[in-house]
Amino acid sequence: MPRLILLIILSLTLSCCGEIDSPPPQSAVPEATNIAIADLRKLVDGRNVYIEESLIVGGYITSNDKASNFYKTFIIEDATSAIEIMAGLYDLHNIYPEGYYVTLKLKDCYIATHFGVLQVGRKAESYSNYPTEYFASRVLLDRHAHPVK
């Protein structure tokens, strides 16, 4: 009898595991992009570029701050290249988990390369050693980055 009760409790415990945090299926990926990340890299060509056009890039999140190896940033990647989003927020892995697809509206953003890494963010201050600045606000970040859940 105790074994039966233990077996029932164990089976109920294991059956409650759901796929709450799993990434969305690939069929949920929107077709809203109009430029590849590799084309952005060619556009930058060693400069800090302000984007005035309605450019939209998309990619899967491949790295975030969960393992503490990226500070306040996350990286999206498409089939051509990758770009670092200078979010400026803590615990980004809760908002942008690995495997999610993100479309990024680049209008009114700055893009540049820093040590070979393509970055998107706000305009850096004149005294800054960095080519782009963090968005540093969830409101600003939400205007540009849209994850598919």
Locations of the language-model features?
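OB-fold nucleic-acid-binding modules
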Residues: C17-Y71, I75-K149
